Amino acid sequence: MITRGRVWKFGDNISTDAITPGRYNLTKDPNELAKIAFIEERPEFSKEVKPGDVVVGGKNFGIGSSRESAALALKAAGVGGVIAKSFGRIFFRNAVNLGLPLLIGNTDPLLDGEIVEVNWRSGEVKKEDGEVLKFKPLDSFLLAIVEEGGIIEYIRRRGDLWIQ
């Protein structure tokens, strides 16, 4: 699970309402949700985001209401995953359940607009200047869910959620 793309950097306390604002959040269609991702925070996001791009946050990324649409919008937009100092617990589980990779660690060295290569399995992020940053990857069980494409595909393929 390696992606390469542009860093879209955000600050601390980015709520699910900032990712998919309620007044625009009128559909369950993933492609329509992708169009409203960060519409008020970064209006250019939905038009410029490319497959493999990485959303980077500070502390408490995805806090707030239990809006599954926030993680779904990012995945549908083609985001390769999200790296943050910490995550809101509900966003964290929604992202895993939808198959959106996550890493945790100090995001200060990552710069908005730079191109990075992310190994979601090992937690290594390689910057264009050659610097390699190390982040905490998901544990093996959660990573298996993400690699299957989310909880539904995980259960379809494996038959249950039994942890071995």
UniProtKB/Swiss-Prot annotation:
Gene3D superfamilies: Aconitase, domain 4
Enzyme class: lyase
Keywords, alphabetical: Amino-acid biosynthesis, Branched-chain amino acid biosynthesis, Leucine biosynthesis, Lyase
Annotated EC: 4.2.1.33
GO molecular function: 3-isopropylmalate dehydratase activity
Pfam families: Aconitase_C
Enzymatic reactions: (2R,3S)-3-isopropylmalate = (2S)-2-isopropylmalate
Top-level taxon of the source organism: Archaea
InterPro entries: Aconitase/3IPM_dehydase_swvl (IPR015928), AconitaseA/IPMdHydase_ssu_swvl (IPR000573), LeuD (IPR050075), LeuD_type2/HacB/DmdB (IPR011827)
BP-aspect Gene Ontology terms: L-leucine biosynthetic process
Pathway listed: Amino-acid biosynthesis; L-leucine biosynthesis; L-leucine from 3-methyl-2-oxobutanoate: step 2/4
Function (record text): Catalyzes the isomerization between 2-isopropylmalate and 3-isopropylmalate, via the formation of 2-isopropylmaleate.
Self-association state and partner proteins as the record states: Heterodimer of LeuC and LeuD.
Family to which the UniProt record says this protein belongs: Belongs to the LeuD family. LeuD type 2 subfamily.
Name recorded for this polypeptide: 3-isopropylmalate dehydratase small subunit 2
Native species: Pyrococcus furiosus (strain ATCC 43587 / DSM 3638 / JCM 8422 / Vc1)
